[in-house]
Amino acid sequence: MAAAVLSGPSAGSAAGVPGGTGGLSAVSSGPRLRLLLLESVSGLLQPRTGSAVAPVHPPNRSAPHLPGLMCLLRLHGSVGGAQNLSALGALVSLSNARLSSIKTRFEGLCLLSLLVGESPTELFQQHCVSWLRSIQQVLQTQDPPATMELAVAVLRDLLRYAAQLPALFRDISMNHLPGLLTSLLGLRPECEQSALEGMKACMTYFPRACGSLKGKLASFFLSRVDALSPQLQQLACECYSRLPSLGAGFSQGLKHTESWEQELHSLLASLHTLLGALYEGAETAPVQNEGPGVEMLLSSEDGDAHVLLQLRQRFSGLARCLGLMLSSEFGAPVSVPVQEILDFICRTLSVSSKNISLHGDGPLRLLLLPSIHLEALDLLSALILACGSRLLRFGILIGRLLPQVLNSWSIGRDSLSPGQERPYSTVRTKVYAILELWVQVCGASAGMLQGGASGEALLTHLLSDISPPADALKLRSPRGSPDGSLQTGKPSAPKKLKLDVGEAMAPPSHRKGDSNANSDVCAAALRGLSRTILMCGPLIKEETHRRLHDLVLPLVMGVQQGEVLGSSPYTSSRCRRELYCLLLALLLAPSPRCPPPLACALQAFSLGQREDSLEVSSFCSEALVTCAALTHPRVPPLQPMGPTCPTPAPVPPPEAPSPFRAPPFHPPGPMPSVGSMPSAGPMPSAGPMPSAGPVPSARPGPPTTANHLGLSVPGLVSVPPRLLPGPENHRAGSNEDPILAPSGTPPPTIPPDETFGGRVPRPAFVHYDKEEASDVEISLESDSDDSVVIVPEGLPPLPPPPPSGATPPPIAPTGPPTASPPVPAKEEPEELPAAPGPLPPPPPPPPPVPGPVTLPPPQLVPEGTPGGGGPPALEEDLTVININSSDEEEEEEEEEEEEEEEEEEEEEDFEEEEEDEEEYFEEEEEEEEEFEEEFEEEEGELEEEEEEEDEEEEEELEEVEDLEFGTAGGEVEEGAPPPPTLPPALPPPESPPKVQPEPEPEPGLLLEVEEPGTEEERGADTAPTLAPEALPSQGEVEREGESPAAGPPPQELVEEEPSAPPTLLEEETEDGSDKVQPPPETPAEEEMETETEAEALQEKEQDDTAAMLADFIDCPPDDEKPPPPTEPDS
């Protein structure tokens, strides 16, 4: 602003003063300059001897320039201030003197307008009442309309500022406002517009004081509602809409609310009556007004030949009043009768030109119909603005009204040549504006263009108004031959068909036309369509998107090449800008099944930057920035790991099992069987197991969708990068479910800090130095606090004693490619198909048989896979089977804690301890005996366990043989193929017992776990980690007895060995077959196991850890046994 510039250091510079470089160059402050300016203006009006600036013009010649002088003076900022009071006082005196004279009254009003706006508060309060009286005197005179208009403008400012000062507000309300209104009501007819402006100001700033004259004001406004002057009619409607707020209301505006509703119903009743009079007989089924409103008594001129015109003018005025009441702010809450208003709108829009007779007054009624429809559309727009999205329940009705109106006013639009305005464009423009407003208010819920007959009709009209007109020239035949045949008669030379350009039509090159014809309706259609696509794009049908692509892309290219220009609406820059806006909307909100035209849009926006119109070129530049952000984001995406893992979190480096990790997510009941046993490896094709599929985790929180491994990842903080989806992580021979991706390439390490939105119930830590089995060390903590450390053959120099009954050396598994999926007992996979029938165990990892032989040995042990459907840990993907099914979460937690402690000890003594399978079995027998002594009530169960142990030992021996032959691989595939990288020795946390609500695994599983070599062979073929899930039956338990070598040992091992995982392996291997069958025994067995485990840990921690370490060593060979699939082939 100029004031800000002048108040700065250079405020007094001559550059800021048009007067020249004379005396003002020495002025150093803005206030001083303003004082000189005020004195200069005063000198222009009345010369003074002491003025610093001599008058330039005589006073009589300064009057025409005074309004301009006031405006120029305002450019220099406020003239108020203590230092300017003297100058302002002089201006006040001048103003009062000029207002007292008829000849100089206009000049006095000019000075008063400056004083009212620029005077300080103290000066304003001092002179406000006197100024108000002066204005009232001016209103009572017969001055010219220009003087009255200026007086009303000053009055408006005066009332606006006085309403802000309580003392003045009270004084004016009680003593002056009624007189002012009376003076305004008495103005001459030629000053009616100024009178309405003054009344509007009084009702706006002093509504309560106007209540005494409410009746007179209402009559005055109604008499002007049907005025022919648009400005006067608009002012009368605005004033009438404020009538309900006049006067004193009750405490909460109740009286005002009732007045507002009465006025609205009265307007509706009057509008229904007027519509019936206008189109009597033209309505097929007129809607009768049933509202409580009383029809207004409007004056009518009898004998007027243009009564229809008067009715139309009244209809327009009352409709505007109704719309203003809906759209204007009101001091109290009101209830809008939406249904009644919509009924009136529908009744008005249903009047069609087809039903109007062309006799008598018919043509005149037809002439008025478009304007009547426009008033109804304006009312609909006001209703949408007032009610917003609360009109959604009437969305279908609104969606039908718009194409209905477009159909009514589409007659004769195709018969005109380019360059001519199409008929009814104003009505169609209003319809498209309402479409844009409706979508803007309701968004995608508006339901526009989302199918249905009305949507198709609306789209057809939109495309018609967007498409540029085409020159249509038709061939005509020689005269006298309408059919085109030559005339008969004298022979003559053959004649050629000529172009029919019309008799009175000039050649196309010299045609007269409007270059901006139809630009308004085209721009409105483009805006409405752009808004609809942007808000509802993904919900709109694919075919609609394709139609728009086929229209918009060629149209943009034609506009850029100048082919579409000429007499088309796209000569207007507004239409071209809206066309680019539509293209951007198609790009930002595409159909899910129709790719957006990204490449074409980028090219179009690049060329659009060369537009001559700054408005168009700037929009294209902005659109390019938006497209660049979409195609080349400068910031990496939040989830770079891959789409298949919805909530993966980076895996921290391997760390020792922590006893602090509680197994809070042990869902009791059969649910665990389905969800907790997901296998990391490929899902076996066994019929029952697929049902488990990617099992949703039973834990609360975001559902963990099946990961790339086909397993639900409940407990893992993140999925190892190598398990993430990727070409190197997908094996060709994948089974039904996604396969654990054992790739030969080293997996990328994931920073432990990153978490991609997934919750972190129990973190699992996996560290991969290489993709080779020997280089992989996995430390997973299960929900049951069980942690298993698997060191593939390469890492531990100690000989790998088979953890389960089988003692196959890890070398055999090592022989197969390094990537040998840990193989659960081959019998388990066989039983899994049958077992899943009773139990829906979590899907076993699909057998990695097809996977590359060199699958990385890293194995994932299901961390605390809750016995319930809780999210299965990736550890299950390994051949490790967590079958411990307990009905009591407490027992599982205790066992898990013991197992975690044992796991820590195992990891420490892993390399040092190596024991034979016989010792391992003896420990299991001792644990069983301890359980029997501790729990006499469960003697029967203990006996069954012993029997099962014996059976499992035999089965383990058989499994060892089977594994050596590689037969277990196929079985594992059927049951639950363990992930090729997971060694069978890894014992899943005891939470898996919950996974299988059926009987808990008995020591037989431990025996099998001790047979990692055979299991590894089978795992290589099938990698069934989920086999434990399919161990619900005893037979299955026996089969699992072989596979449990890969599965986690039961808690019994935990007691015997300091490391919890060995006990889990024993229990799981034994329970893999037995526990699944006797679910009731599971809790008791687990409790006995937990107690005996505590004792065994103290007594035989070292021995147990050694046995388990041997088992774990054997497990890596199982991972290496992924070649077993190839071995069976060989």
Curated annotation (Swiss-Prot):
Chain ranges for the short sequence motif LXXLL motif 1 as given in the UniProt record: 33-37
GO MF, one annotated term: RNA binding
SUPFAM superfamilies (UniProt xref): ARM repeat (SSF48371)
UniProt motif LXXLL motif 8: location: 364-368
Places the protein is found: Nucleus, Nucleolus; Nucleus, Nucleoplasm; Nucleus; Cytoplasm
Annotated Low complexity bias: 672-684
Compositional bias ranges of the Pro residues kind: 639-671, 685-703, 794-824, 835-860, 976-998
Motif extent (LXXLL motif 4): 155-159
Entry annotated with the keyword GTP-binding: no
Tissue expression: Widely expressed.
Motif (LXXLL motif 7): 271-275
Record cross-link Glycyl lysine isopeptide (Lys-Gly) (interchain with G-Cter in SUMO), residues: 826
Motif position, LXXLL motif 10: 579-583
Domain of life: Eukaryota
Motif (LXXLL motif 2): 69-73
Location of the motif LXXLL motif 9: 459-463
Biological process terms in GO annotation: cellular response to estrogen stimulus; positive regulation of transcription by RNA polymerase II; rRNA processing
Composition-biased stretches (Acidic residues): 774-786, 886-964, 1083-1104
Alphabetically ordered keywords of this record: Acetylation, Activator, Cytoplasm, Isopeptide bond, Nucleus, Phosphoprotein, Repeat, Repressor, Transcription, Ubl conjugation
Effect after changing residue 826 to R: Not sumoylated
Required for modulation of ESR1 transcriptional activity: annotated segments: 2-80, 121-189
General remark: Expression is increased in breast tumor samples.
Family statement drawn from the similarity comment of this UniProt entry: Belongs to the RIX1/PELP1 family.
Subunit details: Interacts with HRS, RXRA, SUMO2, HDAC2, RB1 and STAT3. Interacts with PI3K, SRC and EGFR in cytoplasm. Interacts with ESR1, the interaction is enhanced by 17-beta-; the interaction increases ESR1 transcriptional activity. Interacts with CREBBP and EP300 in a ligand-dependent manner. Forms two complexes in the presence of 17-beta-estradiol; one with SRC (via the SH3 domain) and ESR1 and another with LCK and ESR1. Interacts with histone H1 and H3 with a greater affinity for H1.
Protein name, entry field: Proline-, glutamic acid- and leucine-rich protein 1
